[in-house]
Amino acid sequence: LLDDVTDALLALKDEMPEEILAVVGAPLEIEGALYNCAVVLHKGEIISAVPKTFLPNNGEFYEKRWFQSGDARRDASVAIPKLKTDVCRQAIFETEDGVRFGIELCEDLWAPLPPSTMLSVEGAEIILNLSASNELLSKREYRQQLISQQSARCQCGYVYVSAGMGESSSDLVFSGHSVIASCGTIIKENEGYLSDDYLMTA
């Protein structure tokens, strides 16, 4: 599986249009430990990987069985030779037109002190969150509150995307809930449970 992930990332970077900057989720082995990561790709290169910090270990989620927390990578940049890139938890990236963004993953937003808090203090204008948050009664509304409150607290844009219907199983249902918020206001949100590909902009 890990070899297939590496091959897929290398293929994606080669086939992706140069003008697109993409962030995708991937499990990565780093120095003998497995991390749940967001991988940044642009112009035929894998720019970096950001590991998830807060791992849920309750209810239906038991991530600590498989993954290590990225907290140990707070200030360290560690090379991933196969991908010719590195991993660093507190990385801030900058687009060609000067927009600075940071990344956190799913449960990081639910934490008492999300990584996005310090990322915004250090200059991130937009936070991207790659998530796999399942559907339960009223959970959509709870996510809306978390996202709007964090974007208000950090005075930044917040882009949240979750796993879609095709990633559901007999145990968990995912709706593909996606939200774009700015400084406390939700400015775009999808309906969820969409079966076709779509593009959401704001």
Walk through the language-model features, giving the residues of each:
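Enzyme catalytic cores with a strong preference for nitrogen-chemistry domains
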Residues: 1-202
